[in-house]
């Protein structure tokens, strides 16, 4: 959380608690614990990545003979949650069933480590795609945004706010987006922002963080709309709305500064689409779209005609069809005279 009154942040030292003793995270120990405790169910193969609150490993499901991703909460968060509360919260998250949300297969406690299991997506993330191509076409961007917006709308209806929408959490399987990692929603709903930030755990990602999330205010689904607007901007412009050297500076920009007009860096984006993204990035939640589906409808409503050349082509086809009808009518009229 950022204290805007200081216009900077304050670095928080990350200390990890094992029981009542502070210590340092040893990821090899975490992997070793998982490997030993889950040996009869999952064969841990390698580490895929680590964030501020969890580490994820590639594993093989021993029974299904399929690849899965095992996400293990770091000891700090595991200590705050506890196994009983974790089980209650993961039960809510596991009920999410949507074609564009990555499902949960399994969860539990293994030798003190809290974990959950997801399908392994053997593809790339939106981040990988943007790293390769820098920016996407208008059509491809809108296709991805539409599906993610529908997934978010469903999750919000189930009472869950994602809180960490970013390209890394949008996985692409055969080109279809899957929204991953509702774990941060689970953690925040169970523990609370204040307790998490006090331990040094980052809640969300500054480049895509809504102003209200940056200052630790109460959130609703419009915070996810803002983050999705940041992703939309990056897909089309080739960079996020803001650039900063530190997380604290980035959060100040999210709170205080308006993003550059999208069409300055991407003139071929239709004006109404740029306006829709601009509204999604409004500083005040009340000035944004009320829901992801409303944002999606605004994009769809302005996406039917991409350019004047396409409009001209459609008009020419209509004119040609009308002319053909007139000719047929004249031929028939002369024939029956």
Task: Write out the residue ranges for each language-model feature.
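Conserved ATP-binding/catalytic core of the eukaryotic-like protein kinase fold
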Residues: 14-16, 20-260, 320
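Conserved HRD-motif arginine in the catalytic loop of eukaryotic-like protein kinases
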Residues: 288
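C-terminal or otherwise distal, non-catalytic regulatory regions appended to signaling enzyme catalytic cores
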Residues: 2-7, 13, 17-24, 303-337
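Hydrophobic "lid"/C-terminal helical patch
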Residues: 299
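Conserved C-terminal C-lobe helix
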Residues: 268-281
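Short helix/strand-capping hinge loops at secondary-structure junctions
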Residues: 284-285
């Amino acid at each position: 959380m950022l204290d805007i009154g200081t216009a900077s942040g304050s670095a928080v030292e990350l200390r990890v608690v094992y029981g009542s003793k502070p210590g340092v995270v040893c990821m090899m120990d975490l992997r070793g614990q998982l490997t030993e405790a889950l040996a009869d169910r999952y064969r841990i193969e390698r580490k895929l990545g680590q964030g501020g609150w969890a580490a994820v490993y590639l594993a093989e499901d021993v029974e299904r003979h399929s690849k899965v991703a095992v996400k293990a909460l770091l000891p700090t968060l595991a200590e705050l949650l506890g196994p009983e509360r974790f089980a209650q919260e993961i039960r809510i998250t596991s009920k999410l069933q949507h074609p564009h949300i990555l499902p949960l297969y399994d969860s539990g406690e293994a030798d003190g480590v809290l974990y959950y299991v997801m399908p392994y997506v053997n593809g790339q993330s939106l981040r990988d795609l943007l790293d390769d191509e820098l920016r996407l076409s208008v059509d491809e961007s809108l296709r991805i945004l539409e599906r993610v917006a529908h997934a978010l709308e469903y999750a919000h209806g189930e009472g869950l706010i994602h809180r960490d929408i970013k390209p890394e959490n949008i996985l692409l399987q055969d080109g279809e987006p899957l929204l991953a990692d509702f774990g941060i929603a689970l953690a925040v709903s169970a523990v609370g922002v204040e307790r998490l930030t006090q331990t040094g755990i980052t809640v969300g990602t500054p480049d895509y963080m809504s102003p209200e999330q940056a200052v630790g205010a109460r959130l609703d689904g419009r915070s996810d709309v803002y983050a999705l607007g940041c992703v939309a901007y990056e897909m089309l412009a080739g960079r996020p709305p803001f650039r900063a050297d530190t997380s604290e500076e980035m959060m100040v920009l999210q709170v205080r500064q308006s993003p550059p007009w999208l069409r300055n860096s991407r003139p071929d984006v239709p004006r109404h689409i740029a306006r829709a993204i601009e509204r999604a990035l409004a500083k005040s939640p009340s000035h944004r779209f009320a829901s992801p589906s409303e944002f999606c409808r605004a994009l769809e409503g302005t996406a039917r005609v991409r350019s004047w050349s396409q409009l001209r082509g459609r008009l020419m086809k209509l004119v040609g069809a009308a002319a053909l009808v007139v000719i047929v009518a004249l031929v028939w009229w002369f024939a029956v005279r």
